[in-house]
UniProtKB/Swiss-Prot annotation:
This is tRNA-specific 2-thiouridylase MnmA. It is found in: Cytoplasm. GO terms for molecular function: ATP binding; tRNA binding; tRNA-uridine 2-sulfurtransferase activity. Residues 150-152, 244-253, 312-313 are annotated as: Interaction with tRNA. Keywords: ATP-binding, Cytoplasm, Disulfide bond, Nucleotide-binding, RNA-binding, Transferase, tRNA processing, tRNA-binding. Its main location: cytoplasm. It comes from Streptococcus pneumoniae serotype 4 (strain ATCC BAA-334 / TIGR4). The gene is mnmA. Disulfide bonds join 103-200. InterPro entries: MnmA-like, MnmA-like_C, MnmA-like_central, MnmA-like_central_sf, Rossmann-like_a/b/a_fold. ATP binds at residues 12-19, 38, 127.
């Protein structure tokens, strides 16, 4: 049996049940564990309570209980520069970003990893539902978490081989109810704490109100694809491709009573296009173009790959053919896909393994670009 006590693991602790159990398991396995609370955002909730302060209290309680040292580190500047500025720039460009993907790439597995190494870390660990498998030659493969409903490899798809080499995911083989049970059995103060939802820096706040603090809203016309004026939209940044709610036109209908969806955007003319029907023609595409495509292990500069892909979190896999050529990557779908959204991540899988992914630039319908920006 190996002596884990000589291996230092620095755990990113958020004050939630997942990272609490991560630290607990590593401590029980004999590792030299240090807990780190990352303060990435200066935040207060609707009641004026600083949520980070409350979360840090939970980290302190759990760390004291399981007997590990803990520190708090402030990454607010890094977060603003590397994640939030990107988030705003994407919305300005008419896209719908995924800040969680960028937060993992730039903060949790870069700024945090760099900091952990200064503490003598051999590995970092987080409460993500994912797994790593190590080959004899040292190559690390990232695998889906066993809990299919909680698998978070979609958000980890931009991690590099170097980052994965230094990473442990102790919860990857567990299902969420087991994690809660372990926390309760150990009497952890976070055992019944509610899971956080929403984008980390928005939390439960109203998204529209939050975004308007940073980007001025520019109302414009809402049109059908055949030119019918449906009224005013509040600003293109508030709508995403395929969105149903919040259009304010539910009572208006054409030939039937089918619900209305966002089916396109024209940033240059500030027009929001809407159409009726979940599978409206304008929502369907046959391929996409992606950039910032990255694989978790070394690949040739140009290659073609048959695999599956996800275009949003918790979506079933779809069969695709991936053509990687220089800066741009083309992804061709075996079956037409609905609401492929510029700015979101496309993530590639080979069975259980997450191969990597990129950011969606454009969707295409039979070679013609879909007007989604």
């Amino acid at each position: 049996m190996s002596d884990n006590s000589k291996t230092r693991v620095v755990v990113g602790m958020s004050g939630g049940v997942d990272s609490s159990v991560t630290a607990l398991l590593l401590k029980e396995q004999g590792y030299d564990v240090i807990g780190i609370f990352m303060k990435n955002w200066d935040d207060t909730d609707e009641n004026g309570v600083c949520t980070a302060t409350e979360d840090y209290k939970d980290v302190v309680a759990v760390a004291d209980q399981i007997g590990i040292p803990y520190y708090s580190v402030n990454f607010e500047k890094e977060y603003w520069d590397r994640v939030f500025e990107y988030f705003l720039a994407e919305y300005r460009a008419g896209r719908t970003p995924n800040p969680d993907v960028m937060c993992n790439k730039e903060i949790k597995f870069k700024a945090f990893l760099d900091y952990a190494i200064t503490l003598g870390a051999d590995y970092v660990a987080t409460g993500h539902y994912a797994r790593v498998a190590r080959d004899e030659d040292g190559t690390v493969h990232m695998l889906r978490g066993v809990d299919n409903g909680k698998d978070q490899t979609y958000f980890l798809s931009q991690l590099s081989q170097e980052q994965l080499q230094k990473t442990m995911f102790p919860l990857g083989h567990l299902e969420k109810p087991e994690v809660r049970r372990l926390a309760e059995e150990a009497g952890l103060s976070t055992a019944k704490k509610k899971d956080s939802t929403g984008i980390c820096f928005i939390g439960e706040k109203n998204f529209k109100n939050f975004l308007s603090n940073y980007l001025p809203a520019q109302p414009g016309r809402m049109m059908t694809v055949d030119g019918r004026d449906m009224g005013e939209h509040a600003g293109l940044m508030y709508y995403t491709i395929g969105q149903r709610g919040g259009l304010g036109i539910g009572g208006q209908h054409g030939g039937d009573n089918a619900p209305w969806f966002v089916v396109g955007k024209d940033l240059s003319k500030n027009i929001l296009y809407v159409g009726q029907g979940f599978y409206h023609d304008s929502l369907m595409s046959t391929s996409l173009e992606a950039s910032q495509v990255h694989f978790t292990r070394e690949m040739p500069e140009e290659f073609t790959l048959e695999c599956t892909a996800k275009f949003r979190y918790r979506q079933p896999d779809s069969k695709v053919t991936v053509h990687v050529k220089g800066e741009k990557t083309e992804v061709i779908f075996a079956e037409p896909q609905r609401a492929i959204t510029p700015g979101q991540a496309v993530v590639f899988y080979d069975g259980e393994e997450c191969l990597g992914g990129g950011l969606i630039d454009n969707a295409y319908r039979d070679g013609q670009v879909c007007q989604y920006i």
